[in-house]
Design a protein with these regions (language model features):
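N-terminal post-signal-peptidase region of extra-cytosolic proteins
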Residues: 75-82
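Beta-strand-rich recognition domains
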Residues: 22-59, 99-196, 207-312
């Protein structure tokens, strides 16, 4: 009798474990695709950009009072930054640059250099259509060389075929008394997901931001599917580039509110620089050298909720 009970117990355990078999990446992506509404495709899909050249400074770029890009190393850089990610709909837009001295320097100095050009393309997929100039700016040397900080804002009109909610219906986070605890708790939960390489939970956590991201980038069904394949925690691009990915603990952090007070992120000190979000270290497969990186998360609290949600 006892042997029969043991056999039945072992059989039930086996059947349960089979029933709980881990989903494959293909299954996860198929199920995730079903939860995504593929954005409408338009005849004209305008895209806005800012091209920047800088040297011997640190700087931050904000679009509509939400950080879009940052350069904290002080070295020469020349990125082309797409802006649609912060453009919620047609109408007046604002871009702001905050410029700081390089490490251990009190003022911007005589070697500070910053140039930018703002432009757009009527249809970003058609590279034959020339870019359309909006404005240029160059850091005025004589007026700024002795300044410890410089900020400049510009407004421009954008026309896009979509309209998104974004952070327009988010709570004012300055009125949330336990904001730091909420952010740290959310970051720790995301750290656990990353450590466990739980792709399904990761996609679920970032789904609110992805839905709007795909809209403003005019993503096709194939592009969306490619995105999920690329960002799988088990078989995506990171796993092809890195070995021994280790999610690092949260240390020496501060809570950063975006200027609109609707978005928040966690920033960690990283030597003379900063890292936003969750840090990791890994071994580069190609040269076997150790490197570091990060997963950036911003949060908001939608109206009618008390819970933080990942946002663009």
């Amino acid at each position: 009798m006892m042997k029969k009970l043991i056999s039945l117990f072992l059989l039930s355990c086996f059947l349960f474990s089979c029933g709980q078999a881990q989903k494959t990446d293909k299954q996860i992506i198929q199920e995730t695709m079903q939860a995504i509404e593929v954005p409408k495709q338009y005849k004209q899909e305008p895209a806005y950009y800012v091209g920047i050249y800088s040297a011997n400074i640190k700087w931050e770029l904000f679009v509509n009072d939400v950080q879009m890009f940052a350069h904290y190393q002080g070295k020469i850089t020349s990125p082309i930054v797409p802006l649609n990610y912060r453009i919620l709909g047609s109408g007046k837009q604002k871009i702001t640059f905050r410029i700081y001295p390089p490490n251990e320097q009190a003022v911007l100095g005589k070697y500070a250099s910053f140039r930018m050009r703002l432009y757009y393309r009527k249809n970003f997929r058609d590279k034959e259509i020339p870019e359309i100039h909006i404005l240029n700016f160059e850091l005025p040397y004589e007026q700024t060389k002795d300044l410890p900080y410089f900020e400049k804002s510009f407004e421009f009109e954008a026309e896009v075929p979509y309209q998104m909610t974004g952070w327009t219906k988010s709570k004012d986070l300055t009125k949330v008394p336990d904001l730091e605890q909420k952010v740290v708790k959310k970051i720790e939960a995301l750290r656990t997901i990353l450590e466990n390489k739980d792709t399904e939970a990761y996609f679920q956590a970032v789904m609110p931001k992805l839905k709007e991201k795909f809209i403003c980038l005019y993503a096709t069904q194939q592009e969306i599917e490619n995105y999920f394949q690329e960002y799988s925690l088990t078989s995506g691009e990171f796993s092809k580039i890195f070995d021994d990915i280790q999610i690092l603990p949260i240390e020496d952090y501060q809570i950063i509110l975006e200027p609109n007070n609707r978005l928040v992120k966690l920033r960690q000190k990283n030597g003379d620089s900063f890292t936003d979000g969750i840090k990791f270290k890994a071994i580069v497969k190609e040269d076997k050298k150790e490197t570091t990186g990060n997963y950036l998360f911003r949060f908001h609290i939608p109206e009618g909720s008390d819970e933080l949600e990942v946002i663009r």
